[in-house]
Curated annotation (Swiss-Prot):
It comes from the Bacteria. Homotrimer. Residues 249-455 are annotated as: N-acetyltransferase. It catalyses: alpha-D-glucosamine 1-phosphate + acetyl-CoA = N-acetyl-alpha-D-glucosamine 1-phosphate + CoA + H(+); N-acetyl-alpha-D-glucosamine 1-phosphate + UTP + H(+) = UDP-N-acetyl-alpha-D-glucosamine + diphosphate. This is Bifunctional protein GlmU. It comes from Coxiella burnetii (strain Dugway 5J108-111). CDD domains: GT2_GlmU_N_bac (cd02540), LbH_GlmU_C (cd03353). GO terms for molecular function: glucosamine-1-phosphate N-acetyltransferase activity; magnesium ion binding; UDP-N-acetylglucosamine diphosphorylase activity. UDP-N-acetyl-alpha-D-glucosamine binds at residues 8-11, 22, 73, 78-79, 100-102, 137, 152, 167, 225, 332, 350, 365, 376.
Length: 455
């Protein structure tokens, strides 16, 4: 018996008050639907079907990299109708698992428990007990605790309102059962929709075993209906990430002011992360790295014993061991700092390699530049890499010394151990082991008087 997963993702999401389809809104930097797909893939299904509606082609275009079978529900007539669109693509003998694109934190552990504890011919649902179940379908049991049915909130009788055990919507049964039950559904309810939950009563009527598996926590089955619910779930997720990292040996100064936005974040023990740090995409921090406050790291690797000072923004960079960056530094994509390199305050780099032991400490722009080892780049140095049409490369060889306020008009090469005098503007190569100065000689104009205002 193979596993086929159906993810329902066709809801309109009106309460999000957004032009972006709800399932494309991110949690922890990843779209809600993508999170559910990633969890489903951990179960090794042979197929993942996604039933989509609201947002249509926009959803598919944005998430076209996902390994799923897309099925459009042109009319949103309820969850039962949505599953009916996908079930023809499932083999009769398949075990079908139904998930929701706006329930992003469901855990593989809970889903495995559901699959393992549901008889091969039975029906299983994930349930949860909430202090306030308002708006959610209730689990109706008999005097012996057996599940009889699920009643949606709008159809709940007054005496059932006190029930706090709710249906999460997550369900598993065979494809054959669903092919038999789904055509029997009707829309005789307050919402005039075909409820998937009505299959529970049909199963009970047939004598089919129906069981419930409890969620590990309320948050893992929390659906996202509006921005506030998403905000609360985001903070819960970030606390989980902070706890996980802390237990692995990472110091998080304040878990409430830490954000990890990506799946591939690897942090070694003895790393210290100060407040308001954002980690995005693929981030790797080696041992003894220190990240100052208000730092953004995106798709970046940082070597051991390196310190990133406050208010630095770093994207798609490689920073090797024993480096220092910032404060107020910006490293754009393609920046590489070799071991022991130093980038100081108000320095910007793009597509630039700063060699071993080299430093650019202040007020500098380095673009499309290859810098050797033990180079000193003085304050105010600018590589003029763009001529209005094309980008050009600057090369600064080992041991060079660039004075303050120097403009290097690419393409050019500064030779090994060359010295460039402060205030120079170079448009040609500077030879090695020589002092190159390109500025007008200082002069004083005698007898000059400052202009005065006319009376």
């Amino acid at each position: 018996m193979g596993l086929s997963v159906i993810i329902l993702a066709a809801g309109q999401g009106k309460r999000m008050a957004s032009s972006t389809p709800k399932i494309l809104h991110p949690l922890g930097g990843i779209p809600l639907l993508e999170r559910v797909v990633n969890t489903a893939r951990l179960l090794n299904p042979h197929t993942i079907h996604v039933v989509y509606g609201n947002g249509g082609s926009h959803v598919r275009e944005k998430l076209n990299y996902l390994p799923v079978h897309w099925i459009e529900q042109s009319q949103q007539l309820g969850t039962g109708h949505a599953v009916l669109q996908a079930i023809p693509f499932c083999q009769n003998e398949d075990r079908v698992l139904i998930l929701y694109g706006d329930v992003p934190l469901i855990s593989p552990k809970t889903l495995n428990s559901l699959l393992e504890n549901t008889p091969s011919n039975g029906l299983g649902v994930v349930v949860a007990e909430l202090p306030d179940p308002t708006g959610l379908g209730r689990i109706i049991r008999d005097d012996f605790g057996n599940i009889l049915s699920i009643v949606e909130h709008k159809d709940v009788a007054e005496h059932q309102l006190k029930i706090r055990e709710i249906n999460t919507g997550i369900m598993t049964t065979t494809a054959m059962n669903l092919k038999k039950w789904l055509p029997q559904l009707n829309n005789n309810n307050c919402q005039k929709e075909y409820y998937l939950t009505d299959t529970v009563a049909l199963a009970v009527a047939e004598g089919c075993p129906v069981g419930g598996v409890a969620a590990q926590c309320c948050e893992e089955v929390q659906g996202v209906n509006d921005r506030w619910e998403l905000t609360k779930l985001e903070r819960y997720y970030q606390r989980l990430m902070a706890k996980k990292l802390s237990l692995a040996g990472v110091t998080i100064i304040d878990p409430e002011r830490f954000d990890a936005r990506g799946e591939n974040i690897e942090i070694a023990p003895d790393v210290v992360i100060d407040v308001n740090v954002i980690l995005e995409g693929n981030v790797q921090l080696d041992r003894n790295v220190r990240i100052g406050p208000n730092v953004i790291l995106k798709n970046t690797t940082v070597g051991e014993n390196t310190e990133i000072h406050a208010n630095s923004v770093i994207e798609a960079a490689v920073i090797k061991a024993n480096c220092s960056v910032g404060p107020f530094a910006r490293l754009r994509p393609g920046s590489v700092l070799e071991e022991g390199a130093k980038v100081g305050n108000f320095v910007e780099m793009k597509k630039t390699t700063l060699g071993r032991g080299s430093k650019a400490n202040h007020l500098t722009y380095l673009g499309d530049t290859i810098i050797g080892k033990n180079v000193n780049v003085g304050a105010g140095t600018i590589t003029c890499n763009y001529d209005g049409a094309n980008k050009w490369q600057t090369k600064i060889e080992d041991g060079a010394f660039i004075g303050s306020n120097v403009a290097l008009v690419a393409p050019l090469t500064v030779g090994k151990n060359a010295t460039i005098g402060a205030g120079s503007t170079l448009s040609q190569d500077a030879p090695p082991d020589q002092l190159t100065v390109a500025r007008e000689r200082q002069r004083t104009i005698k007898g000059w008087h400052r202009p005065t205002k006319k009376e």
